[in-house]
Curated annotation (Swiss-Prot):
One of its GO terms (molecular function) is magnesium ion binding. It comes from Cronobacter sakazakii (strain ATCC BAA-894). The lineage of its organism: Bacteria, Pseudomonadati, Pseudomonadota, Gammaproteobacteria, Enterobacterales. GO terms for biological process: ribosome biogenesis. Residues 160-333 form the OBG-type G domain. Residues 1-159 form the Obg domain. An essential GTPase which binds GTP, GDP and possibly (p)ppGpp with moderate affinity, with high nucleotide exchange rates and a fairly low GTP hydrolysis rate. Plays a role in control of the cell cycle, stress response, ribosome biogenesis and in those bacteria that undergo differentiation, in morphogenesis control. CDD domains: Obg. This is GTPase Obg.
Length: 390
């Protein structure tokens, strides 16, 4: 299946149903009064995270989602039926962005998590709601309000504990093949990896972590060189980054300069990502003698001003790989994920306390009082009234 990590969709919530103007017509009840019902609320549009999905490719073909409109009110005080909601399933790890405002509406990080992205319109009011002591036969009603409409940008960001960084041919895919059951393509030319891949590293029956491999970065990636930096977003949720450095580059380039390029591209992309814990891992030590590999690694670390611990491994022969994985496992255990509080969904507002409807009622009642003619009122504060009859 083709890997698609970005998609744009249109979501439209249902409009609210209109109120009804109706009067009770029944035998022996000549003045039955108003009995027009309210309309139904429009349906909402929801997103739901599904762990069984791993790509957004479905939304390259189906781009528009519309919830059902609320039914209009009917006579005999019948309220219109509420419009049906629409639920759109997305992979776990999807970020939802409103294209109109650029606002991030939410991150779908848990299976079954739901996020409302378009609220249905409010129902209109029937003429029964406008009955009062001065208006016994109201002919007023209100229309339902339109549902929300949004263009959404969906961005899939892989959920991994460890992210792999490095130049093309640094050995990232070989490392994942060595520590997990994932089998990304491996070859001796640059950009063998074209899409991100995940691997689960199982240390024992109870301990495991997920590692993400992304295509290699080159100088100028922030400006779009190579495969650009579009895949760096998949590392934003990682807790630690493994920066693989090829001790013996096939093109004869300087490993220290290559490392500086990677750090520079990280900083251009995101300061938050650049500030994540980053471990230096020198790969392909099997191509050099032990003394030569250690000396070269120390020289590179000194050139980078690196004062923390670094690792020397060979992903191809799995030399020192197990020790590195255990250190990663201990780091993950000591630094658990801090989940952000999920965005609270607005509670459903009941009719009597709805500001929109209350305002409409007040306006209609004010108009009715202004138009009221009290010539037939027995209680007259202004004196005697004469009524002429033919």
């Amino acid at each position: 299946m083709k890997f698609v990590d970005e998609a744009t969709i249109l979501v439209v919530a249902g409009d609210g149903g209109n109120g009804c103007v109706s009067f009770r017509r029944e035998k022996y009840i000549p003045k039955g009064g108003p009995d027009g019902g309210d309309g139904g609320d429009g349906g909402d549009v929801w997103l739901e995270a599904d762990e069984n999905l791993n790509t957004l490719i479905d939304y390259r073909f189906e781009k528009s989602f519309r919830a059902e409109r609320g039914q209009n009110g009917q006579s005999r005080d019948c309220t219109g039926k509420r419009g049906k909601d629409v639920t759109i399933k997305v992979p776990v790890g999807t970020r939802v962005i409103d294209q109109g405002t650029g606002e991030t509406m939410g991150d779908m990080t848990k299976h079954g998590q739901r996020l409302m992205v378009a609220k249905g319109g409010w129902h209109g009011l029937g003429n029964t709601r406008f009955k009062s002591s001065v208006n016994r036969t109201p002919r007023q009603k209100t229309m339902g309000t339109p549902g929300e409409k949004r263009d959404l940008q969906l961005e899939l960001m892989l959920l991994a504990d460890v992210g792999m960084l490095g130049m093309p041919n640094a050995g990232k895919s070989t490392f994942i093949r060595a520590v997990s059951a994932a089998k990304p393509k491996v070859a001796d030319y640059p950009f063998t990896t074209l899409v991100p891949s995940l691997g689960v590293v199982r240390m024992d029956n109870e301990k495991s972590f997920v590692v993400a491999d992304i295509p290699g970065l080159i100088e100028g990636a922030a400006e779009g060189a190579g495969l650009g930096i579009r895949f760096l977003k998949h590392l934003e949720r990682c807790r630690v980054l493994l920066h693989l450095i090829d001790l013996d580059p096939i093109d004869g380039s300087d490993p220290a300069e290559n490392a500086r390029i990677i750090v520079g591209e990280l900083e251009k992309y995101s300061e938050k990502l650049a500030s994540k814990p980053r471990w230096l891992v020198f790969n392909k030590i099997d191509l050099l003698s032990r003394e030569e590999a250690e000396a070269k690694a120390k020289a590179i670390a000194d050139a980078l001003g690196w004062e923390e611990k670094y690792y020397l491994i060979s992903a191809a022969s799995q030399m020192n790989v197990k020790d590195l994985c255990w250190d990663v496992m201990h780091f993950i255990i000591e630094n658990p994920v801090v989940h952000e509080e999920e965005a609270k969904q607005p509670e459903k507002v009941e009719f009597m306390w709805d500001d929109y409807h209350r305002q409409q009622l007040e306006e209609m009642e004010a108009e009715a009082e202004e138009e009221w003619d009290d010539d037939w009122d027995e209680d007259d504060d202004e004196g005697v009234e004469i009524v002429y009859q033919r």
